[in-house]
Amino acid sequence: DSSGFNLPLAKKLRATYPTKEIIYYILPQAWAWKKGRVAKLEKYCTKLCSIIPFESEIYTDKNKITYVGHPLLDEIKEFKNELSNTNKIAFMPGSRKTEINNLLPIFKELVKKIPNKEYILIIPAKFDEEYIKKIYGDISAFTISKNTHEALKDSEYAFICSGTATLEAALIGTPFTLSY
């Protein structure tokens, strides 16, 4: 991930340690944009570990690239078999302070417009109570959850900050609105 940092690092490592193995895990989405990174990845890295099955198609050196699976598929243990009416709506305003500051006020307004539901605010497990009070402010309208997968599975719908959480919701089977 983060090719803006990792590609220059791989280049520097290759120049400094020409015989060392350089493994790149979670490849940049060169299939979507900036395809020129493919040649750089193949030049600087000895092994490319893909989390998306079709990524190998854009690389010329098939010996360097291996599909290793997606880490979320290992983490998520339960999936929805069908859509449910649990009367629970999940809200995930992100994990960065700016995301939370931008999205939480909107989510609080949404709560007022979607009556007769239980509103689940999913907060990253790493956040302590002091940080939560400081960053989130009044969240008394919400039930708090720090278990993303369980909360998404139990919710009939979610409003989610753009990022990995949208993939989690899609894999679990919870319909959502991507928020940015």
PLM regions with names:
Residues 22, 89, 119-120, 176:
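Hydrophobic/aromatic residues located in beta-strands of well-ordered beta-sheets
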Residues 46, 87, 155-157:
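Conserved acidic residues
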Residues 2-83, 90-104, 113, 124-128:
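Active-site and donor-binding regions of nucleotide-sugar-utilizing enzymes
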Residues 62-68, 87-88, 136-145:
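Active-site regions of enzymes building and remodeling cell-envelope glycoconjugates
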Residues 98-154:
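Donor-nucleotide binding loops and adjacent catalytic segments primarily
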Residues 28-32, 73-75, 139-144, 158-160:
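Short gly/ser/thr-rich secondary-structure transition/capping motifs
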Residues 146-180:
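A donor-sugar binding/catalytic signature common to diverse glycosyltransferases
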